[in-house]
């Protein structure tokens, strides 16, 4: 009985020490908007990549997300936002910090950047708060 009790206590202690961060309602709303925008690119043959990056942007701040991209593929980086954050910009930088030329889309609380890398490697996607607002955002990306 003591052994069973020790085992139960050990499992309880381990499970209590693991803290999982739950998505907030604002992040869920932002992800919904980002997936809706990314779904529109699906009509052109783009597939949505598993996973997403959510966070909170302060006013006139940015968030960087590291991605590995492959030459010959095309990518769309779609961002949705939640109130009070209404307007964001999306930019792509290479590993040296040079800003890449992208095709941009912006519509209210959604924005996207399209990019086709000439070289495979690590790139950085910047999500920027362009107005004096802060709030939640979510980034998803598509490829073909």
Model-based region annotation:
Residues 22-46:
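Predominantly extracellular/luminal regions of secreted and cell-surface proteins
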Residues 41-57:
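Glycine-rich phosphate-binding "P-loop"
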Residues 17-21:
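Hydrophobic alpha-helical segments of integral membrane proteins
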Residues 1-9:
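Bacterial N-terminal signal peptides that target proteins for export
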């Amino acid at each position: 009985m003591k052994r069973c009790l020790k085992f139960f206590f050990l499992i309880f202690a381990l499970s209590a020490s693991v803290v999982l961060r739950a998505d907030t309602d604002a992040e869920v709303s932002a992800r919904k908007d980002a997936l809706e925008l990314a779904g529109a690119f699906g009509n052109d043959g783009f597939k949505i990549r598993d996973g997403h990056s959510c966070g909170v942007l302060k006013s006139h701040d940015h968030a960087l997300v590291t991605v590995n991209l492959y030459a010959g593929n095309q990518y769309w980086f779609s961002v949705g936002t939640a109130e009070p954050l209404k307007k964001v910009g999306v930019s792509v930088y290479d590993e040296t910090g040079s800003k890449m030329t992208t095709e941009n889309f912006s519509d209210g609380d959604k924005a996207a950047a399209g990019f086709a890398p000439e070289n495979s490697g690590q790139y950085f996607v910047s999500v920027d708060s362009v107005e004096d607002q802060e709030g939640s955002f979510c980034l998803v990306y598509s490829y073909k």
